[in-house]
Amino acid sequence: MTLESISSGGRVRDALSGSPKVAIVTGASSGIGLVGLEKQRPNNEEEVPVVLLHGTSGQSEDWSQVVEQLTKHRPVIRLDYAEPVAGTDSVDAPRVSDFADRVVAAAGAGGRHRFDLVGFSLGAAVATFIAAEYSEMVRSVVLVSGFSYGADPRMRLQFDLWLHLARTDKTALGKLLLVSGLSREFLSAFDENTINGIIQSFVAMNDWPLIEQNIRVDLAVDVREQAKKIKAPTLSITGKYDQIVPPFYTQELADLIPTAKRAEIPSGHLSFMEKPVDLASAMLTFLLEKHP
């Protein structure tokens, strides 16, 4: 689960919702559109893009600092794929497979039928599903803080707690996500007023029905069989100090994937925030090694 209301400067980001969108960047300006590429180099229509998938309460903007590094070498597409569905307790609430279908449809709508795929946390489960079930579209895979099974006793307890707090004590959930999502070193850089401001903004500016929906998707995650089917080159990246998806779970997911290699980032769960350069470097080293 991401805490999208925090940026490297402590600013707040509005939660995005609705149908899948792709962030488009040309030079220093940015906007949101249906389909587009982020790039810092001359356009090459045949170049395979990197598609980025956010986590449970995340949005495409979470990747901004990572994208600054990636686009020096590769075009990037980042999607807001978690379209809200009315009635989060409904049997019609989305599953990982629904999110996967949305990602593939959005990429295809832009004429991108082959891509490298990066998923974070819940997005890693979505990426795992896509790599297995749409294998012809996925050239390589990077899974960041991924997990394979949301009903694991520890993961289920965590997601049940998130869901309870999202409904009853949003401030407590914000505090919990700060404590468990960030490393001690990174969190210690914020003073008390900044931390309180982050929590207040997290409560005020999030799309809570969407978050509840996506926590329910977390609980239903089971991509163990899909992981075994992945044939594309795969990198599993672990946050050394991750308390939300502890290293055991990323290891467990990687062990299911025949092609998986492993890397570790010295950060908590939110590595895209704590160590964006390290994270981008690990991605690029892998991707450029496989596809120079």
Regions found by a protein language model. Name each.
Residues 37-89:
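Conserved HGGG/HGGXW glycine-rich cap/lid loop of the alpha/beta-hydrolase fold
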Residues 230, 236-238, 242:
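Short beta-strand/loop motif that positions the catalytic acidic residue
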Residues 65-68, 77-118:
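Active-site loop/oxyanion-hole signature of alpha/beta-hydrolase fold enzymes
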Residues 267-280:
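Catalytic histidine-centered segment of alpha/beta-hydrolase-like enzymes
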Residues 132, 139-169:
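Flexible "cap/lid" loop of the alpha/beta hydrolase fold
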Residues 152-154, 172-226:
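Conserved alpha/beta-hydrolase catalytic His-Asp/Glu region
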Residues 29:
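Conserved glycine-rich cofactor-binding loop
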Residues 119-123, 127:
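Gly/Ala-rich beta-loop-alpha elbow adjacent to hydrolase catalytic centers
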